[in-house]
Every structure is written in C-alpha cells, then in structure tokens.
Design a protein with these regions (language model features):
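Short strand-turn motif at the edge of the Rossmann-like AdoMet-binding core
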Residues: 63, 87-92
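A short acidic, Gly/Pro-enriched loop at the edge of an enzyme's catalytic core
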Residues: 49-58, 73
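Short helix-capping segments at alpha-helix termini
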Residues: 11, 33-38, 77-81, 105-107
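A short glycine-rich, Lys/Arg-flanked "PGG" loop and its adjoining helix->strand segment in the class I
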Residues: 69-84, 99
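Conserved SAM/SAH cofactor-binding pocket of Class I
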Residues: 1-48, 52
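Conserved SAM-binding loop
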Residues: 17, 60, 87
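Core SAM-dependent methyltransferase catalytic element
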Residues: 107-127
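Conserved short alpha-helix immediately C-terminal to the canonical SAM/SAH-binding motif I
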Residues: 23-27, 67, 94
Length: 127
C-alpha cells in the first residue's frame, strides 16, 4: 500500500499493487481511498505479479532475497525495455545472490542503497 501510494504521489499514472496478506490489502485499499488515489491505484491479493496487465515501466517489491530471485524471470517478462525494478528487503549477505540472478535474467544493477544490514537495489532492463 505505502509503495503504491508513494508511486502515485510521485506521478505514476496507473499503479497495480499486490500483497499476499488479506489484511494488508484491506488496509491499503482504505488508505488509498482516504488519500483520493483510488482512480490510479488498484490493490489485489496475490503473489507479486498476479493479475498485472501488460508490461510496466517500473516494478517495486519489498520482499526477501529468495522471493526476489524466484520472481526475476517473471519480472523480466513484465518489465518494458529500459524499465526499472526496485527491490528492497534484501539482507546484505544475500546481495551477491540477487545480483547473480539479476544478471542471469538480463538485469544490471544501477544503484544499491545500504542501511543497517539491509539493501535496496535499482535494476535496469536495458536494450
């Protein structure tokens, strides 16, 4: 919810948010409605890319490294050329594993932010 709202407030025109947790989906929908963003943000329950139509310019996920590695092939298909995948929730020790999987799926690390043993990575899918 908070990532979808931030994307909307930063100018994204259409946002499809997905969370596996039913309560998180409920709360996200309420917060999005309260902030007047329902016309641009939809929230569904499911796995990361379940029900996302077409391709995206940006995909954002705050999940652990194992799941990021698992979904990278699907992200590669769902992300437009020159698109960006922002992945956070990665413990620093797993960053090399994520980078290896990213390269295997056609991504390049563009930026890495580290704080208190956690990492956020911006990956690019280039032409």
């Amino acid at each position: 919810g908070i990532l979808a709202m931030a994307a909307a407030l930063l100018g994204a025109k259409t946002i499809h948010a997905v969370d596996i947790d039913e309560k998180a989906v409920e709360v996200a929908r309420e917060n999005i409605a309260q902030n007047g963003l329902s016309d641009r943000v939809t929230v569904n329950q499911g796995n990361l890319l379940d029900g996302t139509p077409g391709q995206a310019d940006l995909i954002i996920a705050n999940i652990i490294a194992d799941i990021i590695i698992l979904v990278l092939p699907e992200v590669a298909v769902k992300l437009r050329q020159n698109g960006r995948f922002l992945a956070s929730g990665i413990i620093e020790e797993r960053l090399p594993d994520v980078e290896k999987a990213a390269k295997e799926n056609g991504f390049t690390f563009l930026d890495v932010k580290r704080k208190a043993g956690w990492c956020a990575v911006t990956m690019g899918k280039e032409d």
